[in-house]
Amino acid sequence: MNKYNLKGYHDWNPAVEEYYDWYAKGRYPNNEEGRAHYLGQVHYMDKEIGLLLDLLEEQGLRENTLIFFISDNGGSTPIYANNKPLRGSKYLLYEGGIRVQMLVSYPKKYEKGKVYQNMVSAMDILPSICKEANIKIPDYIDGMDLTPLLKGVNDSLKHDVLVWDTGHELAVRKGPWKLRKSFNDSEAKYEMVELELGNFITNLNTDIGEKINLIKKEPVILGDLEKEYSVWKSKLEKGDNKK
């Protein structure tokens, strides 16, 4: 901060007793103040984002500023998030752990108030920013440029397939179909939620809560999604620790 002549916060202490007292209680499932505390944090965040937008407005920059707002994962059960009607939470590959909102604002170029259900990803943010900034999108980027969708040029733009692999679980999404394979429930225990181990096929158009396993009824779908996973994995580049 000194480098940029900014005033330092010399009395700042990350080990604030109030915060740690709360965190100690936060992981208890029956804390009466839990949900209220969570909603208070969300309200505070919303207020702070509003201050940033107000500043952009005051500086005359709001119309020509591209803003993405997205969560990196679904809400966490121990801190009283609620992902219903989606099943699961942070760390897990149920929809409650991986399906999140993405809000995009660019008043100068994008129409306000439009809602899309297209399957997109956080990977798409970088190539979209590159496109708007007239920067060449690197060939090795996995994401795609969303600007044709956001400008209303191509309303059907979406990923045909998305794949996740955490080591504990893997998931493949293709259209309404989803394959989830779960091998280890340690993350679920941390999140205080139930995780069914095994292999599962779900039609998300009819079962957004992932309650019905269609794996025995849909062997062709299973084979197709397993093939998509194999293709995806074969394209991964191995690092120095080649295992």
Where are these regions (language model features)?
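Bilobed periplasmic-binding protein-like "clamshell/Venus-flytrap" ligand-binding domains
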Residues: 157-158, 230-243
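Short Gly/Pro-enriched turn/cap motifs at secondary-structure boundaries
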Residues: 90-95, 161-163, 169-170
